[in-house]
Amino acid sequence: MKNILFFLIVCISLTSCKDSHANSVEVPVTYTNDTTNMVYLTYSGTSVSAVVCENIKNYVTITSTGSHVRVIQSPNVGLSTGEIGYELTGTSENGSFYMEGAYKSTVGLRALTLTNPNGPAIDIQNGKRVEISIKRDTENTLTDGTSTAVDAWKGCLQCKGHVEFKGYGTLNVYGNYANAIWSKEYMTVRNCTINVLKAVKDGINCNQYFTMESGVVNISGQGDDGISVGLKNNDTSAENTGSFTMTGGTININPSGASGTAVNALGNQSVASSATLNTSWTQSASNVSDGGKSVKVLREGQVLIIRNGRTYTPNGNLINN
């Protein structure tokens, strides 16, 4: 009898430790006849409410523990349904957004202030294309915590797939545990303003490649690299793997006592004349620079500076016309 009782106690203990969403409840949902495939989530302190388009109600399951929202997207979402969009707004000092799916999606941020003391503020477990739409003229702030009460995480905003940041708003990110922004695959930035204000590790950490087309990225308060670009699945032969490219926009990186480099890419780096990369890093023997643009290149990569349609090496040698 004692052995049976001990076994039951252990089982209950293990179950409660493993399932952090055991006490989650369904989020109050208002359905709308709109057919735009949207889910609207409004955070308000320790609670959250949802508005869901009627045509996709059978394709999303929304639960929460307080303001910690968990969205599970049906595996049946695909070409016939179209992608589902999520728009987050409101404020919570103890909340988060978790989304799990297997088809491309868009997550919009509209005047959102979200802090998770025990994990990432936004956690997207979707290996497809995920667009982060920062809504026009809005300021959004994400902050994670320092507690390891849950499984370790890699970024205040983290994504399993490839992330495309777009929009004409502002996103502020405080990474108090690891990186501020982390993506398992590639990352692109267009039009928006991203301010990384703190990162225990890298300001931005992604794999495959990083491309800046337009907009502004400001990085400060990081403990290691400003931007780190790794390989895709450690495949050194994959196209564009580990590359850093700027075709436009502005990136400002302040070392803030960091031990890393401004840009640490495992592949080639290219900065066009229409783009600006500013850093106050002190150049070291392992770095190359162009006008103070300090970068680190590994895996026999190279830095290309493009001016007026011509490509140069950092020391000014013309490669092609």
Regions found by a protein language model. Give the residues of each.
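Generic alpha-helical secondary structure signal
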Residues: 10-11, 35, 47, 316
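C-terminal motif of bacterial Sec signal peptides marking the signal peptidase cleavage site
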Residues: 13-16
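C-terminal outer-membrane/trafficking sorting elements
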Residues: 285-321
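Positively charged n-region of N-terminal signal peptides that target proteins for export
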Residues: 1-4, 18-19
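A composition-driven surface/loop motif
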Residues: 18-287
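Short, low-complexity S/T/E/D/G/P-rich linear segments that nucleate or cap local secondary structure
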Residues: 6-8
